């Protein structure tokens, strides 16, 4: 049913279609809602019942694509602002005490000590938390820099990062892990 809903010819299916058309449809329900719909589709033996489930998965994936592109556009707008002041004013991270605020400020200053940011850290409050990593990956590809995307989640600010080969993001984040609620 998922093959037909995506208008694919089952006789000409290739790895590309599985990895970049069908797979993302199955994955979208888990990203945006619950993986239950994908599981129900896999277990459904009645084709007539499977078609609406497949259509819903395709719709969720289409929504995920639109939300991802909107997040990427928002991130690019933030990065391409004219002045550093405009850029830094968009980020409002709350920390619990003055010592952490000072350490956080020093860490940001160190990362941005020259004209070019070494690591891009973006706060996109309206970004769906499950899309932060995809958006970070797209920004990393575009700017060739390690990127962290932060967004609002139920338990506070949550983030996802994507790095480049020349930068050990895990090591750098580990060095300041006491600044995070979870790491």
Regions found by a protein language model. Name each.
Residues 1-183:
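Hydrophobic helix-and-loop "lid/oligomerization" segment in the mid-to-C-terminal part
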